[in-house]
Amino acid sequence: MADPSEQPATAEETVRYANSNVKMRGAYLEGEMHGDWAWYRTDGSVMRTGQFDRGRQVGTWRTHDRSGRVVKETGFGEPAK
């Protein structure tokens, strides 16, 4: 079993609007955005979703309208190997 002290430091973050709805949510790995991230409108609807690989946008990012329908997709490079 790996020594826990050798594992990368991770942290999750959730930022909220004044009305307490979530504004953005995601995780950090060693201080860099990493993994799934999402941004929301003040009404709580999803605005944009995508992934980071150690601070770099990767994969398909999606922009959603207020009903949740995908209105735009943007592709970014794949994660570093």
Region annotations inferred by a language model:
Residues M1-K81:
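Glycine/tyrosine- and acidic-biased, solvent-exposed loop/turn segments at the edges of beta-strands
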